[in-house]
Amino acid sequence: MEALEMIAERRSVRKYKNERVSRELMTEIIAVSSWAPSWANTQVARYTVIDNPALIARISEEGVNGFTYNMKTLQNAPGVVVLSYVKGKSGKLHAENFATTKTNMWEMFDAGIACQTFCLTAHAKGVGTCIFGVIDDVAIAKIAGIPEDESVAALITYGFEQGEHVKPTSRLSVDQIMRVKEE
């Protein structure tokens, strides 16, 4: 699948077949995702793969703040990835002599790049994904056994899509999102 086609066709998938995605395929997806760029190549993204139905049910009940829409998607998903990042590594260089004003949040930027890379790779391999942001990071970290030096960035449900691929949604025109400053 061509990169431009993959970007244009990837959609959030919320309905999955009752079919487990193999650990081998998940390993392939995460191996490609490990190439996502990060601040000074700090590679802070971590992927905790959960395909145990009991743990997914716990995340559904305790980890999405009662948001029914996400609860239903989780209940239907054969797997979920807890995307986390190692805290305190991104946003600064050379013992903090050089840093961005966004040091306290650059890890989320790196996690976002890793998340998109994961979702595009999964799509290229025939696996649908949906990224959740309405989450209880503390509850999810506890359920997933995330180390204390990491923070949860997002949940990503995954599985083989059931039914027809979601139709494209409208996009803002380039004129609405692009500025050109010439002076």
How should these model regions be labeled?
Residues I7, I29-S33, V81, I156:
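Short alpha-helical scaffolding segments that buttress acidic/His motifs in well-ordered protein cores
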Residues A3-V13, K17-N18, K89, A154-E183:
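C-terminal helix-cap and adjacent tail motif
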Residues M71-A77, I146-K167:
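A glycine-rich helix N-cap at a beta->alpha junction
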Residues I29, S33, E96-I143:
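Small-aliphatic-rich amphipathic alpha-helix that forms the alpha element of a beta-alpha
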